[in-house]
Amino acid sequence: MPAEARDRSALAQKSFERLAEVCGDITAPVLEAYYREHPGARQSFVDHGLGETAKLEGRMVAESLFLLLTWTENQSAARIDHGSAIVHHNDTMRIPPHWYLGMVDAVLEVLLGTLPAEADDERDMWREVRSEFARFVQSLREEFVRSDGGAPLPAFPVAKM
């Protein structure tokens, strides 16, 4: 693993350990943040959850955490894992890229809320990861069979960083 990836991985581990210590299970606060920004996504979880909405929601929160960790350790692997998933979610399940990115943003909002003021290195790394992932999501939009409407993907609110 290149030195930069090791550094990012170490910062991510530090952030995730603190997140677990401070929050424990982050599912509820992540979903609160997610549905606040994407209220229309709630019905999609009900529809796709097939009676197991809470289980699906929990799995998507965990998937977003794992995506962020993987992105810091091996961006190529994360791109392979999520490249087809993002297109599939849009084209087959009608889950637009705003919602996909929104779940990652909700996880980051909760995670960033646990960082101490002096953790600029972690904060900067997560800003960079979010920016990289948003560019990746944007790059996949040209592969969509079903248009998502083309509205720009949102920037991560500075106030939440």
Label the predicted regions.
Residues 1-161:
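Globin-like tetrapyrrole-binding proteins
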